[in-house]
């Protein structure tokens, strides 16, 4: 039988079935852990975008609020159930008062879609923080959008200039090369390959 031309085919088929079965069992047994980890990571990102405002309001420190996850998430963060928004939205509540909002945003990158979280002040005029949830950019270049220097430049940025004015009231920013230094508050550094 070993000299038969069918032996390698049957052997490979049996090996494929065995290893596919092992892989399927491993996936099914770890699926709930993977989903729980994904959910925890997402909630921590939401909390991180809201933690500075929560800390400012409570007199605590943002690091302490983050360290107390999941209790701090359950205490301060509430999902906004509004189907008209068309996206996930959350609010930070301290002493029965909303102190900030967090919205999920998305768009196209060079290699795939991206998801991010942006937190705003309650009047929606200021971007408080920004965090990348998911991106599929090149690890050496485009994925640099997750680096602290890039994310930090969006913190506490004015988003709406004159809310009562007619027409477009959003603040315009100019994107400059990463190697340049911003000359004014209206310039943000960009990463080539991550738009």
Predicted regions and their residues:
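Flexible, solvent-exposed loop/hinge segments and secondary-structure transition points
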Residues: 1-195
């Amino acid at each position: 039988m070993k000299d038969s031309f069918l032996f390698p085919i049957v052997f490979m088929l049996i090996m494929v079935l065995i290893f596919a079965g092992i892989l399927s069992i491993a996936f099914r047994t770890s699926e709930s852990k993977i989903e729980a980890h994904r959910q925890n990571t997402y909630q921590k990102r939401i909390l991180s975008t809201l933690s500075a405002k929560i800390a400012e309001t409570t007199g605590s420190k943002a690091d302490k609020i983050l360290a107390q996850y999941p209790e701090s998430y359950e205490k301060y963060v509430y999902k906004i159930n509004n189907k008209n928004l068309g996206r996930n939205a959350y609010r930070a509540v301290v002493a029965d008062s909303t102190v900030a909002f967090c919205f999920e945003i998305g768009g196209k990158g060079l290699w795939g879609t991206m998801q991010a979280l942006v937190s705003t002040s309650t009047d929606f005029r200021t971007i408080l923080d920004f965090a990348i949830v998911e991106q599929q950019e090149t690890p050496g270049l485009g994925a640099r959008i997750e680096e602290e220097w890039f994310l930090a430049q969006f913190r506490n940025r004015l988003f709406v200039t004159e809310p009562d004015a007619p027409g477009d009231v959003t603040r315009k920013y100019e994107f400059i090369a990463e190697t340049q230094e911003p000359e004014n508050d209206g310039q943000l550094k960009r990463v080539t390959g991550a738009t």
